[in-house]
From Swiss-Prot:
It is found in: Cytoplasm. The gene is gmk. It is an enzyme of class 2 (transferase). Its EC number is 2.7.4.8. Essential for recycling GMP and indirectly, cGMP. Its main location: cytoplasm. It comes from the Bacteria. This is Guanylate kinase. It catalyses: GMP + ATP = GDP + ADP. One of its GO terms (cellular component) is cytosol. It comes from Shouchella clausii (strain KSM-K16) (Alkalihalobacillus clausii). The keyword ATP-binding applies. The keyword Kinase applies. CDD domains: GMPK (cd00071).
Amino acid sequence: MKREKGLLIVLSGPAGVGKGTVCGALRNQNTAIEYSVSATTRKPREGEKHGVNYFFKTREQFEQMIEDGKLLEWAEYVGNYYGTPIDYVQETINAGKDIILEIEVQGAQKVRTVFPEGVFIFLAPPSLKELRDRIVGRGTETEDIINERMTVAKEEIDLMTMYDYVVENDKVEWAVERIKAIVTAEHCKRERLIKKYKELVEVEK
């Protein structure tokens, strides 16, 4: 009997909504979910490590990855490239393990066309004011960049309809529990299990 493939879980939302914080909290709970590391051309923030948080690339290196077809998706966001290396994602799913991608909304749209069977979760802020406060609190962006991110965030919230689920990140621990519940429910879906049990019935005949 063939092994059930893992889930591709795509978590995205506006910049500053807390995608990295939520994924970090999931990781700290030692869940069975694997984590895909994205590539980016943006500069590392304090505490970020190459190969752990991101693969930090030059524009030339990133553009070579695009040309070589090494990315599942990629997008340019506020002057920087972001993308998902494809090999690790495919190998993990084929091994029957779940993997979560923490990516920008623009990238999630591209993944949807390649992996329509993925589980797409939009992480939403409690309010736009709260989102702006979180971005300002980072202390890493200029006022112009903050305004640009807020304009983009409003456009991204309008794209919420392309997602399977919406999780409000009011409190990190609550958001984590909602995502875990979604993953559990997805593994119990009829369309994921029916083939397995039909094969079992055939073996018993």
